[in-house]
Amino acid sequence: MVPWLDPNDPFPPVERALGPATGAPGLLAASADLLPSRLIDAYLRGIFPWYSDGQPVLWWSPDPRMILAPAEFKVSPSLRKTLKRVLRDAAWEVRVDHDFAGVMRACAQAPRRGQRGTWITAEIIDAYTSLHRSGNAHSIETWHDGRRVGGLYGVAFGRMFFGESMYADATDASKIALATLVAHLRDQGLEMIDCQQNTSHLASLGGREIARKAFVAHVRRAAAEPPIPWQFDKRALAALTGPAGAAAPRGIER
């Protein structure tokens, strides 16, 4: 059994999350509230919400944790070709925080293999939009001919970014947004993007798992640092379109 949290109850230590032998590895707690203060506290502890309509708010801290180090981002030859085309063609834009709620709604509506419905409920959209208004959640959006065709959103504290979801209505549109974000974070010296759980898609882009203990320790350090600027555009992609496409790893603990 996982603990039920009343509004003033603190999170239990993440080490108490359910283990791999259970049906819900990483599940830590449940609650009825998704207040911004609760959400902020969760991220700073390496915890995130994930639940469906009709369920209580379920809080997770899996071990291991999937992350993407910007320095280890893999740019395939086909993606590099796409990014070069985006840089050349004025019809392509990458905008930051232009339509945050719209990106969230598009992510909610995007079909997911093996999933029915969405975990991005109206309650989730309201909570993360509140974080966006306070400067702690951002959207990176791919636009073509004046229409938003893909993007992603996530949470940011200090020098830590927590990726949440992405969508694409055009081929590679979400990858364009992710690549632009990665290029900006590399330029700012950020070492880690939280990806929460392992997927083959993330692994193909350079994502890997690290121990929860190492992840939480990194979050505590990075989130306490001054925030980075969140003004950039597709010109950041120039750093990824050279022959190498990836910088040397910066030594994140595994």
From Swiss-Prot:
Keywords: Acyltransferase, Cytoplasm, Transferase. It is found in: Cytoplasm. It is an enzyme of class 2 (transferase). GO terms for biological process: protein catabolic process. Signal peptide: none annotated. Its EC number is 2.3.2.6. Belongs to the L/F-transferase family. This is Leucyl/phenylalanyl-tRNA--protein transferase. It comes from Burkholderia vietnamiensis (strain G4 / LMG 22486). The gene is aat.
